[in-house]
Amino acid sequence: MSAPLVIVAPPGHPLAHLKKIPLKRLQEEVFLVREPGSGTRSAMERFFAEREIHLKTGMEVGSNEAIKQSVQAGLGLGLLSRATIEQELELKRLVVLDVAEFPIMRHWYMVHRRGKRLSPVARAFHDFVLSEAKQLVGSGLARTKPQRHHNTDRAGRPK
């Protein structure tokens, strides 16, 4: 399932209504980031490092919810999975910035051992996740067929 990462701001932020914001412009902003080791933070650091963009970190936090609340309070910008901010977008508490080269596409996978039969509970969970993913596909936020990322080997490990 695809999980696009987007940059969010409070609705009144100066960048909120601009189009195709250049990446270099983001160097002037303060970012609220996840803790070291977080997949979101790793994707963010890799993306900006590859483009030689250096962001200012205002605060490290341990949850997406803390980033959402801090961004809403005007403490900085955040990078979050689009799937985690639907309610805030609907309530107009956050806006997704239109940034060049965005969104960053991440992928979530569900795996289990080949040939191993899933328990009834595991099967119910598997079916539930796939059902939810199919609903997201209709919204354009997800894809249920796993595809290998061009920067990974056949096992999904970074090259």
PLM feature spans:
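Short secondary-structure boundary segments
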Residues: P11, R82-T84, E101, W108
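Hydrophobic hinge/microswitch elements
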Residues: G37-L97, D153
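Ligand-binding clefts/hinges and TM-proximal coupling segments of bilobed small-molecule sensing domains
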Residues: G37-F47, I53, V129-K159
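A late-sequence structural motif
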Residues: A16, G39, V95-S139
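Flexible hinge/capping segments at coil-to-helix
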Residues: M1-F31
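Active-site-adjacent beta-strand anchor residues
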Residues: V8, V33-R34, E60, G78, ...
